[in-house]
Amino acid sequence: MDYSRYHSLSCERQDQVLIVSLNRPEALNAINAALHTELSHIFADIALDQETNVVVLTGKGRAFSAGGDIKWFQDLTPPQLEALFTEARKIIVDLLEVQQPMIAAVNGPATGLGATLALFSDVIFAADNARIGDPHVRIGVVAGDGGAVIWPWLVGAARAKEFLLTGDLLTAAEAERIGLINRVVPAEQLMATAVTLAQRFAAGPTQAIRGTKVSVNKILRATVNLVLDTSLALEKQCFFTADHREAIQAFIEKREPKFTGR
C-alpha cells in the first residue's frame, strides 16, 4: 500500500508494523480540515494493506492530539459542516473495519477526537506525562464523534458520564486505574513498548489474532450502530447554538465562556 499521498499523517513501515503518526506537531496535532479528511481515508487503506499486520498509532512531537482545531471550527460554512460529519462517521466506521491489531502510543495530551482515536485502538499505552479527556462539552457541543460510544464501553456508564459531562482530563495514572487505558509507561520507553508488542503480534498467528479482535469487537460494532448516528446528529445541532458560538469567541479572546443554555 502506498501512503505517500498522506501529509497530515506520517506513515512509517517497520517490516509488518505500520507506524501512523498524526503530523501537525506545531499545533499539538490538533485536527484541522486536512487532517480530518486524511483520517477519513487512512483506515480503509490500512484494512486493505496486505503488507501490514499491526498498526501503531501515535503523534509527532509532544502531543498525541489536542482534538479538533478551534480555528477550523470558527470558519465552517454549512456545506463544510455537513462534510465534517460525513467524514466523522466514516472515521469511526472504518476504524472498526481494520482487522489488524492497533496499538495506541499516547505520547502526550489526547483530547476530544484525539482521545477517541486512541481509545478505539485495541491496546492503549500512555506516557506517564500524558493526559486524556473528551472536553467537547467545554466548547458547547455533544461528545458525538465516538466519545459517547467508547468511554462507556471502557469504563462503564457512570464514570463515562462523569468525564464526558464535565470534560475533565485524566492523568495517565488515573486513566490506567479506572481501566480507560492498558498501561502507563515512562515517556522515554513508550514507543519501544508499543513496537515490541506490535512485533509480537506481527510474528504471531495473524489469522487467529485478527479473528479474535473481530469477535471481541462485535459488541462494540453493535454499540456504534446504536449510538453513533444519534450522537453525531446531536453534536451537529450544537454547532448552531449560542453556547457554542460563545465558547469559540471565548477561546479567541482567551477568557472563560459564559454559557446561557441556548
Question: Positions of the model-derived regions?
Answer:
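Terminal peptide-recognition signature
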Residues: V20, R24, L39, L57, ...
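Structural motif
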Residues: V17-S21, V56-T58, T77, I103-A105, ...
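Glycine- (often His-adjacent) and acidic-residue-rich active-site loop
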Residues: Y3, L48-E51, G59-D94, A110, ...
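Crotonase-fold acyl-CoA enzyme core
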Residues: D94-I209, L232, F240-T241, E246-Q249, ...
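Conserved CoA-thioester-binding segment of acyl-CoA-metabolizing enzymes
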Residues: M1-K60, V93
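Short loop-to-helix capping motifs
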Residues: R24, D49, G204-P205, K254
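Short, charged, surface-exposed hinge/linker loops at domain edges
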Residues: K213-A222
